[in-house]
């Protein structure tokens, strides 16, 4: 009964994927992304630009999962590919979209787009993926509401629901945390281990950079 009530009060409408994307456009813009499904799209010539935070619609990948491999949005901070977003209809289980679709897109970035890849985490060329139906998060219908997010940089991470989108600045702060964590690990590693051929086997100039 509680689930039925939540479903009827949540926007009280069934949106198509196209309608969902218009809703997501508006949400992304509120968080600092430049988003416009009709105009900021790959097929109309939009490409990443320095100083721009683009959510580029219909970004092509080599995925064979669905829609000829087009991700609904690719998120760029300047020239850096930082996220993939999938939009779904209201009756779709959102976390499952991350598992079977978003992950596939994040692995199968086209070779000609590698210039936008920050780095690779295992088989993933994109750090963050999102899936949503545009509906506000409701605990009663948890898997069919909210913005679901997965940080692909660590295999132990699981999808989780967010109350809102992450801004371009927030994305860069998340990426910086990853860098800071790696640097902290190096800073706390004994220099003998850094030099050890059976350890990290770093060169002297690399060790000096860590000491600096």
Regions found by a protein language model. Give the residues of each.
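ATP-dependent helicase/translocase motor core
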Residues: 1-212
């Amino acid at each position: 009964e509680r689930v039925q009530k939540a479903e009827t009060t949540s926007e009280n409408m069934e949106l198509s994927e196209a309608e969902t994307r218009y809703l997501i456009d508006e949400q992304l813009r509120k968080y600092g992304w430049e988003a416009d499904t009709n105009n900021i799209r790959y097929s109309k010539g939009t490409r990443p630009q320095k100083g721009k935070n683009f959510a580029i619609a219909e970004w092509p990948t080599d995925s064979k999962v669905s829609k000829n491999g087009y991700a609904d949005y690719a998120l760029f901070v300047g020239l850096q590919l930082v996220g993939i977003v999938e939009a779904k209809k209201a009756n779709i289980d959102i976390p499952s979209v991350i598992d079977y679709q978003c992950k596939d897109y994040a692995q199968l970035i086209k070779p000609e787009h590698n210039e936008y890849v920050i780095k690779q985490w295992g088989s993933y060329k994109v750090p963050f993926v999102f899936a949503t139906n545009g509906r506000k998060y409701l605990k009663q219908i948890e898997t069919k509401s909210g913005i679901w997010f997965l940080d692909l940089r660590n295999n132990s991470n699981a999808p989780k629901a967010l109350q809102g989108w992450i801004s371009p600045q927030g994305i860069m702060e998340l990426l910086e945390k990853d860098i800071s964590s790696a640097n902290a690990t190096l800073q706390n590693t004994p220099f003998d281990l850094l030099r050890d051929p059976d350890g990290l086997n770093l060169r002297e100039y690399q060790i000096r950079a860590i000491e600096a």
